[in-house]
Amino acid sequence: MPHQLWFTAFLNQYLAGPVSAMMSVLHVPNPHPRAPISNYVAMEILVFLLLVLFFIATRISLSWDKPGVLQHIAEGMNNFVSNQGEEMIGHGYETYTSYIVTLGVFILSMNLIGLIPGFEAPTAFPSVPLGCALVTWFFYHVHGLRENGVIGYLKHFLGPVWWISPLLFVIEICSHFARIMSLTIRLYANMFAGDMVTLAFFSLVPLGFPVVFMGLHIFVSLIQTYIFITLAAVYLAEATAHGHD
């Protein structure tokens, strides 16, 4: 039986049976039938539920005359991403704002939840950054195809010089697959290292001093979230551009 956080144990207590049955039907390996939900999955679920509550509370408290704290936070995040999207994507950026905002809030929340005692940052486990990277990868390719069509989108991979197009096509395909690993490793490595440093100083130095490293962890969390959504916007801009038409 693996070590379980209290929220993981709570979920496994009530959902282990249905989850194990579903994994069996899908032929997914399940080494721990009595605890099929891992810590990072439980933390993702918790973050999702907390964000749902946050946005419901924000929606209920919306006001033109006297916007509350939650509304200011939500509008601030949306305006920041909108400004970044307008600069990097240009015309039509509004179509992708909701995805980038959702992605950024989700990643940032997962980065920060590890600072709360009894919780772990899901992004410190490689499967979670990989999932975010794969969703982003498929998202920008789908919208690239939608904007340019199959032929128009393939031109992005061929370059302007026809006689080296086959070589450029192979290079571009490899570079696009490499983006998955780049997004994954960058987020995972930084959050894993940040968690380890914070835990190490909590155990070695007097109480109070680790607050400095908690501040550093928050800074790293913000930076990594910003880098991830910025790269997502850049990839979207490249995929939806019509420069080779």
Curated annotation (Swiss-Prot):
Query: Can the keyword Protease be found in this entry's annotation?
Result: no
Q: Which Gene3D superfamilies match?
A: ATP synthase, F0 complex, subunit A (1.20.120.220)
Where it mainly occurs, coarsely classed, is: membrane
Subcellular location field: Cell inner membrane
| Entry keyword annotation includes Cell inner membrane | yes
Keywords assigned by UniProt?
Answer: ATP synthesis, Cell inner membrane, Cell membrane, CF(0), Hydrogen ion transport, Ion transport, Membrane, Transmembrane, Transmembrane helix, Transport
Going by the entry's taxonomy, the superkingdom of the source organism is recorded as Bacteria
GO MF = proton-transporting ATP synthase activity, rotational mechanism
Q: Share an example GO biological-process annotation for this protein.
A: proton motive force-driven plasma membrane ATP synthesis
Its GO CC terms are:
plasma membrane; proton-transporting ATP synthase complex
Q: Look up and give the membrane topology term.
A: Multi-pass membrane protein
Span-the-membrane segments of this chain are 5-25, 37-57, 99-119, 125-145, 157-177, 187-209, 221-241
Q: What does this protein do?
A: Key component of the proton channel; it plays a direct role in the translocation of protons across the membrane.
Xref: NCBIfam families: ATP_synt_6_or_A
What's this protein's family per the entry? Belongs to the ATPase A chain family.
HAMAP family from the UniProt entry: ATP_synth_a_bact
Q: How does it assemble?
A: F-type ATPases have 2 components, CF(1) - the catalytic core - and CF(0) - the membrane proton channel. CF(1) has five subunits: alpha(3), beta(3), gamma(1), delta(1), epsilon(1). CF(0) has three main subunits: a(1), b(2) and c(9-12). The alpha and beta chains form an alternating ring which encloses part of the gamma chain. CF(1) is attached to CF(0) by a central stalk formed by the gamma and epsilon chains, while a peripheral stalk is formed by the delta and b chains.
* Stated name of the protein: ATP synthase subunit a
Provenance organism: Koribacter versatilis (strain Ellin345)
Gene (name only): atpB
